Amino acid sequence: MTMEVSKKKGGDFQQCHELIPGLPSELALECLVRVPFQFQSAMRSVCRSWRSLLSDSSFIQERRRCGKTELLLCLVQPLTPPIPASKSVDETLMVDEKKSEDESHPRVFCTPRFGLSVYNAAMSTWHRVAFPEEEQIPLFCECVVLQDAGKILLIGGWDPETLQPTRDVYVLEFAGRKWRRGAPMKESRSFFACASVSPTKVYVAGGHDDQKNALRSAEVYDVEKDEWSSVTPMTEGRDECQGFAVGMGLRFCVLSGYGTESQGRFRSDGEIYDPATDSWSRIDNVWRFPDTSPRGRTAGDFRSSSTLWCFTDTDLQSERRWETNDDSRNLKLDLQSIQLPMTGSSVFAGSLGGESVVMIGGKRESEGEGEGGVMMKMTTEKKMGKWSHHVHIPCDFSTLPFSHASIYV
């Protein structure tokens, strides 16, 4: 038994009441770890011992041991539907030019609010995570998971009131179901690369500042110390780049992006950071779609392989597969372009527990009936992608996500 129910870390759970009256603690624990995740909020209100048990990080380890963990896909997405066609852009954004002396930026009203949506793959259910009433989720923030720590982080993005890049960090403790403020980044940034590269570290790089300048800078967040540290900057400024962990999850890859003077023309190369040497290596010929951002169009399981799936609207007969190495020759990426199986009003690709999934939006409300969308999983057979497992997305959750992460609970 990997978890003691009679003794909690810190010594404040030395003697607990019976978890289930009349049952030995070990047997009671075997029952409680089998309760589906969706009912665990209600379990917390039953008694203090249950609340303490569910708040302990080792509870998820017991669920994992019993094979009862559930996979959640977490999505940062707008809460409001797309702008109606009859309404002009000028009507949707209203800027208050009457600034007080201590305001460095005007406040912007009527911008869409963002939320954190969750799809439970085991139960095929959708719900939205409550956020503190006095706060708002930053627009276009990055969502990243630290699985072993049981935490979801929302990093950077735009301030909802000023639409300026922010340094803010919000941490959701899944065990206690509580939000807290994390230490802010050293530099404000949005549309940057972000990934967890070890059980306790999150790296960010690139993006742009409040003047739309592409950034070279990079930082690392230590979740245990709740602090940020600067690392060696990249050789190129990269706005709208994509980040992921490679090399068995030990290095940080920043894919494509564009410079300040070439906005909208996405680079074909990338850079890979090695924490062991605090240095970057370059990887060429990795992104062959200069008119398309890699954000929301790539997926892969880089913890155990080096394959990157690139999802496209058309079938690229001559460029279906290619491979490339970084200039240190320490890492090889195998890339494959996959044509999307259907079209829709929006497309977002990502990873769900190491498998590739694509969310395709349906009709907009202004086009008539709201159809929601569909999510499809791609399985790999003989190194070829095959679509399966169609999941209907309710209308309330079918807006285009900006970032995502998946976590076992």
Curated annotation (Swiss-Prot):
Transmembrane keyword on record: no
Q: Which InterPro entries match?
A: F-box-like_dom_sf, F-box_dom, Kelch-typ_b-propeller, Kelch_1, KMD1-4
UniProt superkingdom: Eukaryota
Q: Where are the Kelch repeats?
A: 98-148, 151-199, 201-248, 251-300
- Pfam families noted in UniProt: F-box (PF00646), Kelch_KLHDC2_KLHL20_DRC7 (PF24681)
Keyword Repeat (UniProt): yes
Q: Where does the chain cross the membrane?
A: none
Q: What is this protein called?
A: F-box/kelch-repeat protein At2g44130
Q: Which residues form the F-box domain?
A: 17-63
> Which GO BP terms sit in this record?
negative regulation of cytokinin-activated signaling pathway; regulation of phenylpropanoid metabolic process
Per the record, GO CC terms? cytosol
